[in-house]
């Protein structure tokens, strides 16, 4: 229930003034999506919104993981890529896109093509324990 409340709050924030034309994506994060796949019971859900002017907002809520970092990366499913946005730890199990985050033109095109992903890192799996492709 807390997850639904947190994601509901994220959706309300993303649905604020001026976000009517945003592309909003719901993302499920699992270890199976990592490259290479990670065996873990940890999961996550995210709501990410991208405006036509390339501004990004949203958050990830995790379960069953003691995360120390979370990022948005650029790469297609099945590949690893560079960090493009560092998420901020804002509350227990919640990571948010920082205010003012914005994609470049090339990154925006990658977003539209489904070639961005969320990655959450733990001490147990420092390269990433759970991942979810951001597919508009």
Regions found by a protein language model. Give the residues of each.
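Bacterial N-terminal signal peptides that target proteins for export
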Residues: 1-11
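Metal-centered catalytic cores of metalloenzymes
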Residues: 2, 20-70, 74-136
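A generic hydrophobic-segment detector
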Residues: 9-13, 135-136
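Hydrophobic h-region of N-terminal signal peptides that target proteins for export
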Residues: 11-21
């Amino acid at each position: 229930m807390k997850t639904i409340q947190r994601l509901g709050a994220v959706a309300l924030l993303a649905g604020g003034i001026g976000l009517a034309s945003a592309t909003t994506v719901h993302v499920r994060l699992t270890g199976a999506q990592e490259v290479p796949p990670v065996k873990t019971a940890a999961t996550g859900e995210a709501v990410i919104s991208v405006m036509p002017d390339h501004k990004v907002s949203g958050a990830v809520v995790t379960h069953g993981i003691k995360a120390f970092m979370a990022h948005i990366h650029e790469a297609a499913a099945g590949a690893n890529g560079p960090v493009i946005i560092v998420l901020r730890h804002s509350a227990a199990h919640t990571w948010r896109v920082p205010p003012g985050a914005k994609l470049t033109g090339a990154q925006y095109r990658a977003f539209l093509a489904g070639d961005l992903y969320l990655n959450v890192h733990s001490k147990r799996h420092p390269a990433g324990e759970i991942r979810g492709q951001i597919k508009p």
